[in-house]
Amino acid sequence: MKRLLSLAIIASLAISYATPAVAIQESKVEVKHIKTEKVKPTTNKYEYVNLAFWRGFNDEHLNAYIVKALENNKDLKMASLTIEEFYQNVAAQRASQLPTINAGFLPGYSDIGAGAFDSYAVPLIASWELDIYGKNSNKTNSVRKLWESSILDERAAYISIASAVGSTYLNIVKLDAMIDLQEDIVKLRKEIFEMMEISNAEGLVSTSDLVKANQAYVAGVTDLTDMKKNRSKLLHQLAVLTGDSPNNIEEYARADYRTLAFSGNIPETVASEVIMQRPDYLKAEKMLEKAGIDVKVARKECLPSINLGGLVLFNAQHIGSLFNSNTALWGLGGGLLHPIFAGGKIKANLKSKKIAYEKSLRNYEKVNLTSMQEVNDSLVSVNMDKEKLAKQKEIQTLEQKDFELTKLKYQEGVIAKLDLNQKEENMLSVNQMVYASEFDCMVDYISYYKAVGAKTL
């Protein structure tokens, strides 16, 4: 009876680990198995963001915000936890390549007509699927590719957060400049309106011109309010990016907009190979490699599975004699099963994996094109905005000369104070335009930094 019991358990082990297999006609999808470099997590997260680039802005406040974001940003913490989660998935899948051993304790009580008695059993069951086709190791490699992809996602997140912090900070300093100049413009427009109000009372200025001056003053105040509102919103955004409370924005120091400048070098052209260091490009490669491995696994599901099983069973009426040699039995067995009919499941699974591979291939091609587009777009923005800034600085120089001449005329009594104020307002508007373009250029540098994966600059 015990022998029959042990054989039944071993047979059930063999059946439970058997894999259905049927003949499958190959589809027309050509699967190319690529091999990429292994990716491992780094303990120095600062390597992701290339701090040398940020030091090119020569701004200690910006550098401090970048470091603060790397240490406290919640998205980055979640990205790091995702890596650990996927690593545990790899460990769990790798365990399927090893034998499993289970133990149990089965107390019982029975009466078969000869008197009641107790019974105790302790089974030890071992099973192992022989990975002679490499199917389980392929499954482990497939899960490992997801883990490596999560590492690349973390790198992409670090670059993205650093870029967001830099762009947000520069736009805040840009608004500092706009607000400073706008306050001077509003002050001048108020003076112009007050002077025109006096002139209108004396009949020297028409009511229509007075209304226009008042409209310009009110519009200037409205623009100033919008600028302050946008700056507060950006400060809130910077606080969240750095893992801080938006209630602390009054403590956020910035550089003087008159001195902030980028001393780094951005090339006018770049080789197309630069996209190969972007984390999204590398991830697309990993996912394509994973899809190829999944097709391998699906093909190997067609093959029979070979399993080994073992049983040691201790069975006695008294618990004290449970582990005696005469109460034990053991057995070894194996199984090889190749079912004839599986309802088309294996064939459908293989086709599904090939479709997934083709989707990964198309995504890889798309990422390739999108990466080149983003690099080219960033270079066009850098070069064109530099050219625009150069022209605007020429206009600024001419406007400054014109204003100096106007001041001389006013000092000589040739023109009125109203004319001088209007000319000064024009100069301030041009200064706003130039500062805006300067900061737009610096934001373009950050876009290029992000487009090339924060590596080659």
Provide a role label for each language-model segment.
Residues 206, 225-275, 416, 443-457:
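Short, solvent-exposed, mixed-charge loop/turn linkers that connect secondary-structure elements
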Residues 77, 97-119, 127-156, 160, ...:
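Small/polar (Gly/Ser/Thr/Ala-rich) solvent-exposed segments
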Residues 78-93, 157, 161-184, 188-198, ...:
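Amphipathic alpha-helical coiled-coil segments
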Residues 62-64, 78, 119-121, 167, ...:
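Transmembrane beta-barrel architecture of outer-membrane proteins
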Residues 19-89, 259-289, 339-340, 368, ...:
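Bacterial Sec-pathway N-terminal export signals of envelope proteins
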Residues 227, 279-280, 360, 437:
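Metallo-beta-lactamase
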Residues 1-18:
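Gram-negative bacterial Sec-dependent N-terminal signal peptides
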Residues 66, 123-125, 169, 271, ...:
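Membrane-embedded beta-strand positions in outer-membrane beta-barrel channels/transporters
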